[in-house]
Every structure is written in C-alpha cells, then in structure tokens.
Amino acid sequence: MVQRLTYRRRLSYNTASNKTRLSRTPGNRIVYLYTKKVGKAPKSACGVCPGRLRGVRAVRPKVLMRLSKTQKHVSRAYGGSMCAKCVRDRIKRAFLIEEQKIVVKVLKAQAQSQKAK
C-alpha cells in the first residue's frame, strides 16, 4: 500500500515557500524535505546584456549577506556589477572621448596660430 504523506509544517498550501521533495529515511519511511528557494546571480548594471554575471555566487539575499567579499564580486573595475564586455566598451569609449578632446584642443591651437600670422 502507498504511504500517505503530510506536510511537517502548518502551511498546507502548495506555495513557493512550501516546496518539498521526497526523501527516504533510514527507517524506510518516505517523508517530505523542504527545499530552499533557488538564488539568482545579479544582472549587469548596463541593462543591455541579457545574461547573469559570472564569478558571483547565485544565492538568496540572506545568504549573500553572510558571504565574504571575494565571493560577491570579481577583482576588476566594476566587478560584481557590470560584465567584462561592458567594462571593456566603457573604457574604450572613455579613451576615445579623451582623444577627441585632445584633437579639438590641437585644432584650436593651430587655428589660433594661423590667426596670429
């Protein structure tokens, strides 16, 4: 005969916080074990990249609070908040903007020297 199972806690509804799995005890009984909710790794701060960040533990917020800093970020600029590709693009963009400013400054200086002649 099939063994009937009952929840071990008071909540009797099949909600997200009441998910269970079956487990066989050493006494050969089948009982419910409550499963923890699955964590998600953070998304990139750029908002463009679809995936989750690599190198950051995918855990629930309460567990994240207890983790060490090395498990919550990667050792890079914007590590733990932006993905590597976006950081690379941001650095390139900043470099090109600075180069453009220098070019404008040089062109102004040349125009100034042309007027002085």
From Swiss-Prot:
Q: Which PANTHER family match?
A: 60S RIBOSOMAL PROTEIN L34
Encoding gene, per UniProt annotation? Rpl34
- Chief place of localization: cytoplasm
| Residues with Phosphoserine modification | S12
- Gene Ontology MF terms: structural constituent of ribosome
List residues, modification N6-acetyllysine.
Answer: K36, K43
Q: Which UniProt keywords apply?
A: Acetylation, Cytoplasm, Endoplasmic reticulum, Isopeptide bond, Phosphoprotein, Ribonucleoprotein, Ribosomal protein, Ubl conjugation
Q: Any one Gene Ontology biological process term?
A: translation at presynapse
Complex and partners: Component of the large ribosomal subunit.
Q: What is this protein called?
A: Large ribosomal subunit protein eL34
The UniProt record lists the keyword Cytoplasm: yes
Function recorded in the entry: Component of the large ribosomal subunit. The ribosome is a large ribonucleoprotein complex responsible for the synthesis of proteins in the cell.
**GO terms under cellular component:** cytoplasm; cytosol; cytosolic large ribosomal subunit; endoplasmic reticulum; mitochondrion; nucleolus; postsynapse; presynapse
Q: Which family does it belong to?
A: Belongs to the eukaryotic ribosomal protein eL34 family.
UniProt superkingdom: Eukaryota
User: Annotated cross-link Glycyl lysine isopeptide (Lys-Gly) (interchain with G-Cter in SUMO2) - which positions?
Assistant: K108
Q: Where found, per UniProt?
A: Cytoplasm, Cytosol; Cytoplasm; Endoplasmic reticulum
Which residue stretches, if any, does this entry annotate as coiled coil?
none
